[in-house]
Amino acid sequence: LPIHKKEILFIKLRALKREEMEDVFRSAAVFGVSVTDYDRSSLILESVKTESENDDILKYYKKHFLSRMEAVRGGAVAVESVSRSDR
């Protein structure tokens, strides 16, 4: 049976310079994640995607902000699809 499966991911980035903040807002738009909170030098991203998509997002931000990053992942949740796969 087809299912819909998602995982929640929060990423906090801190001690960001103005240019870095702008880059993070742009990359968040590209990844399709939400900026849920921010101030002058920190922000929190929220992603509700598949586990592998969240892996890719984490990999990107770790590459650029590892020492200034916190990440929290929730477990995956799933529900059976209501549409039939043979359509």
Where are these regions (language model features)?
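Long, contiguous binding/interaction regions
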Residues: 1-87
